[in-house]
């Protein structure tokens, strides 16, 4: 009976040791930050004409001039 208990304890220790060794390794985060919005949400969230912008991709007309969404390429 003592041998059976000793075998059970040894087997349990081996199983627990295997679980510790197979635990996942944390991933290293990349230095470059990726865009968070999917293409669907980028399309839905485009800014109207006259809204403030930083980039052509933010405007519904794809024209950001003088930090405002523009309708035409050349403004007076």
Swiss-Prot record:
Name the UniProt record assigns to this protein: Liver-expressed antimicrobial peptide 2
Subcellular location: Secreted
GO biological process, any: defense response to bacterium
Primary localization class, coarse: secreted
Propeptide: 23-36
GO cellular component: extracellular region
Disulphide bridges: 53-64, 59-69
Range of residues in the leader sequence: 1-22
Family: Belongs to the LEAP2 family.
Function in brief: Has an antimicrobial activity.
InterPro entries assigned to the protein according to its UniProt record, in alphabetical order: LEAP-2
Top-level division of the source organism's lineage: Eukaryota
Alphabetical keyword list: Antibiotic, Antimicrobial, Cleavage on pair of basic residues, Disulfide bond, Secreted, Signal
């Amino acid at each position: 009976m003592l041998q059976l208990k000793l075998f059970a304890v040894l087997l349990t220790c081996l199983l627990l040791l295997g679980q510790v060794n197979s635990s996942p390794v944390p991933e290293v985060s990349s230095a470059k930050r990726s865009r968070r919005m999917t293409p669907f949400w980028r399309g839905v969230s485009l800014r109207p004409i006259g809204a403030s912008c930083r980039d052509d991709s933010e405007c519904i007309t794809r024209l950001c001039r003088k930090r405002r969404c523009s309708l035409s390429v050349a403004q007076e």
